[in-house]
Protein backbone atom coordinates (compact mmCIF):
# COMPACT_ATOMS: atom_id res chain seq x y z
CA UNK A 1 0.00 0.00 0.00
CA UNK A 2 1.44 3.34 -1.05
CA UNK A 3 1.79 6.04 1.58
CA UNK A 4 0.75 9.61 0.93
CA UNK A 5 3.04 12.52 1.82
CA UNK A 6 1.64 13.11 5.31
CA UNK A 7 1.94 9.40 6.17
CA UNK A 8 5.54 9.38 4.95
CA UNK A 9 6.30 12.44 7.08
CA UNK A 10 4.82 10.68 10.12
CA UNK A 11 6.97 7.61 9.49
CA UNK A 12 10.11 9.73 9.08
CA UNK A 13 9.31 11.71 12.24
CA UNK A 14 8.71 8.52 14.25
CA UNK A 15 11.93 6.91 13.01
CA UNK A 16 13.92 10.11 13.55
CA UNK A 17 12.70 10.26 17.15
CA UNK A 18 13.64 6.62 17.72
CA UNK A 19 17.04 7.02 16.01
CA UNK A 20 17.85 10.04 18.18
CA UNK A 21 17.27 7.98 21.34
CA UNK A 22 18.71 4.65 20.15
CA UNK A 23 22.04 3.15 21.21
CA UNK A 24 22.56 0.91 18.19
CA UNK A 25 21.04 0.00 14.83
CA UNK A 26 20.94 -3.26 12.94
CA UNK A 27 19.49 -3.43 9.45
CA UNK A 28 18.75 -6.99 8.39
CA UNK A 29 17.61 -8.63 5.18
CA UNK A 30 14.33 -10.37 5.90
CA UNK A 31 13.09 -11.56 2.48
CA UNK A 32 11.50 -14.99 2.83
CA UNK A 33 10.69 -14.61 6.52
CA UNK A 34 7.23 -15.93 7.37
CA UNK A 35 4.51 -13.89 9.06
CA UNK A 36 4.72 -16.13 12.13
CA UNK A 37 8.47 -15.55 12.42
CA UNK A 38 8.04 -11.77 12.05
CA UNK A 39 5.26 -11.75 14.65
CA UNK A 40 7.41 -13.69 17.12
CA UNK A 41 10.33 -11.35 16.47
CA UNK A 42 8.15 -8.26 17.00
CA UNK A 43 6.83 -9.68 20.27
CA UNK A 44 10.35 -10.38 21.50
CA UNK A 45 11.44 -6.90 20.37
CA UNK A 46 8.73 -5.24 22.49
CA UNK A 47 9.82 -7.28 25.52
CA UNK A 48 13.50 -6.37 25.13
CA UNK A 49 13.27 -2.65 24.35
CA UNK A 50 14.00 -2.89 20.63
CA UNK A 51 12.13 -0.79 18.06
CA UNK A 52 11.58 -3.03 15.05
CA UNK A 53 10.19 -1.70 11.78
CA UNK A 54 10.09 -2.52 8.09
CA UNK A 55 10.14 0.76 6.19
CA UNK A 56 11.24 2.05 2.80
CA UNK A 57 14.96 2.72 2.70
CA UNK A 58 14.53 6.30 1.47
CA UNK A 59 12.34 7.07 4.50
CA UNK A 60 14.79 5.36 6.86
CA UNK A 61 17.67 7.26 5.27
CA UNK A 62 15.90 10.58 5.81
CA UNK A 63 15.05 9.63 9.38
CA UNK A 64 18.65 8.92 10.38
CA UNK A 65 20.02 12.17 8.91
CA UNK A 66 21.62 14.18 11.69
CA UNK A 67 21.96 11.17 14.01
CA UNK A 68 24.90 8.89 14.72
CA UNK A 69 23.38 6.37 12.29
CA UNK A 70 23.71 8.67 9.27
CA UNK A 71 26.96 6.85 8.45
CA UNK A 72 24.89 3.81 7.45
CA UNK A 73 22.77 5.61 4.84
CA UNK A 74 24.72 4.37 1.83
CA UNK A 75 24.25 0.74 2.92
CA UNK A 76 20.46 1.00 3.22
CA UNK A 77 19.70 -0.90 0.02
CA UNK A 78 17.23 -3.71 -0.60
CA UNK A 79 14.39 -4.96 1.58
CA UNK A 80 15.55 -4.28 5.14
CA UNK A 81 14.20 -4.63 8.64
CA UNK A 82 15.45 -1.93 11.03
CA UNK A 83 16.09 -2.80 14.69
CA UNK A 84 16.98 0.08 17.02
CA UNK A 85 18.16 -0.72 20.58
CA UNK A 86 16.48 1.74 22.90
CA UNK A 87 17.45 0.44 26.35
CA UNK A 88 20.68 -1.54 25.96
CA UNK A 89 23.20 -1.34 23.10
CA UNK A 90 23.30 -5.11 22.60
CA UNK A 91 19.55 -5.76 22.67
CA UNK A 92 19.03 -5.49 18.89
CA UNK A 93 22.05 -7.72 18.28
CA UNK A 94 20.71 -10.38 20.62
CA UNK A 95 17.27 -10.16 18.98
CA UNK A 96 18.54 -10.54 15.41
CA UNK A 97 21.04 -13.25 16.37
CA UNK A 98 18.37 -15.25 18.21
CA UNK A 99 15.82 -14.85 15.40
CA UNK A 100 18.39 -15.84 12.77
CA UNK A 101 18.98 -19.18 14.53
CA UNK A 102 15.53 -20.37 13.51
CA UNK A 103 15.40 -18.48 10.22
CA UNK A 104 18.21 -18.81 7.69
CA UNK A 105 16.62 -16.08 5.54
CA UNK A 106 17.22 -13.39 8.19
CA UNK A 107 20.71 -11.92 7.79
CA UNK A 108 22.21 -8.83 9.37
CA UNK A 109 23.46 -6.40 6.75
CA UNK A 110 24.35 -3.22 8.66
CA UNK A 111 25.54 -2.83 12.25
CA UNK A 112 25.91 0.75 13.47
CA UNK A 113 26.82 2.01 16.92
CA UNK A 114 28.56 5.13 18.16
CA UNK A 115 28.65 6.83 14.78
CA UNK A 116 30.47 3.93 13.11
CA UNK A 117 29.33 1.23 10.72
CA UNK A 118 30.62 -2.29 11.19
CA UNK A 119 30.43 -5.41 9.02
CA UNK A 120 27.41 -7.66 9.49
CA UNK A 121 29.63 -10.19 11.27
CA UNK A 122 29.84 -7.76 14.20
CA UNK A 123 26.26 -8.56 15.15
CA UNK A 124 27.78 -11.33 17.32
CA UNK A 125 30.00 -8.80 19.07
CA UNK A 126 27.05 -6.50 19.67
CA UNK A 127 24.94 -9.41 20.92
CA UNK A 128 27.67 -10.37 23.40
CA UNK A 129 27.62 -6.98 25.11
CA UNK A 130 26.41 -7.34 28.69
CA UNK A 131 23.01 -6.08 29.74
CA UNK A 132 22.87 -3.16 32.15
CA UNK A 133 22.31 -5.49 35.10
CA UNK A 134 25.22 -7.71 34.07
CA UNK A 135 27.50 -4.69 33.67
CA UNK A 136 26.52 -3.38 37.12
CA UNK A 137 27.20 -6.81 38.64
CA UNK A 138 30.65 -6.87 37.00
CA UNK A 139 31.38 -3.38 38.30
CA UNK A 140 30.28 -4.33 41.82
CA UNK A 141 32.56 -7.36 41.75
CA UNK A 142 35.52 -5.29 40.57
CA UNK A 143 34.90 -2.74 43.32
CA UNK A 144 34.51 -5.31 46.12
CA UNK A 145 37.39 -7.59 45.07
CA UNK A 146 40.19 -5.49 46.71
CA UNK A 147 38.32 -5.43 50.03
CA UNK A 148 37.73 -9.18 49.84
CA UNK A 149 41.40 -9.84 49.08
CA UNK A 150 42.45 -7.60 51.99
CA UNK A 151 40.12 -9.48 54.36
CA UNK A 152 41.54 -12.81 53.19
CA UNK A 153 45.09 -11.54 53.72
CA UNK A 154 44.28 -10.39 57.27
CA UNK A 155 42.69 -13.76 58.03
CA UNK A 156 45.71 -15.62 56.60
CA UNK A 157 48.11 -13.55 58.72
CA UNK A 158 46.03 -14.25 61.82
CA UNK A 159 45.98 -17.98 61.11
CA UNK A 160 49.72 -18.04 60.40
CA UNK A 161 50.47 -16.41 63.74
CA UNK A 162 48.60 -19.23 65.45
CA UNK A 163 45.48 -17.25 66.17
CA UNK A 164 43.29 -19.69 64.26
CA UNK A 165 39.89 -18.33 63.47
CA UNK A 166 39.94 -14.78 64.83
CA UNK A 167 36.15 -14.46 64.90
CA UNK A 168 35.73 -17.80 66.71
CA UNK A 169 38.43 -16.89 69.27
CA UNK A 170 36.73 -13.57 69.97
CA UNK A 171 33.36 -15.28 70.43
CA UNK A 172 34.69 -17.84 72.98
CA UNK A 173 35.58 -15.34 75.76
CA UNK A 174 32.26 -13.60 75.26
CA UNK A 175 30.44 -16.91 75.67
CA UNK A 176 32.41 -17.74 78.87
CA UNK A 177 31.48 -14.47 80.56
CA UNK A 178 27.79 -14.88 79.85
From Swiss-Prot:
Presence of keyword Lipoprotein: no
InterPro entries in the record: Ribosomal_uL10, Ribosomal_uL10-like_sf, Ribosomal_uL10_bac, Ribosomal_uL10_bac_type
One Gene Ontology term, aspect cellular component: ribosome
Keyword terms of this UniProt record: Ribonucleoprotein, Ribosomal protein, RNA-binding, rRNA-binding
Function description: Forms part of the ribosomal stalk, playing a central role in the interaction of the ribosome with GTP-bound translation factors.
Gene Ontology molecular function terms on file: large ribosomal subunit rRNA binding
Entry's family note: Belongs to the universal ribosomal protein uL10 family.
Native source species: Stenotrophomonas maltophilia (strain K279a)
Self-association and partners: Part of the ribosomal stalk of the 50S ribosomal subunit. The N-terminus interacts with L11 and the large rRNA to form the base of the stalk. The C-terminus forms an elongated spine to which L12 dimers bind in a sequential fashion forming a multimeric L10(L12)X complex.
Gene Ontology BP terms: translation
Parts forming coiled coils: none
Official protein name in the record: Large ribosomal subunit protein uL10
NCBIfam families listed in its UniProt record: PRK00099.1-1 (NF000955)
One Pfam family matching this protein: Ribosomal_L10
Taxonomy of the source species: Bacteria, Pseudomonadati, Pseudomonadota, Gammaproteobacteria, Lysobacterales
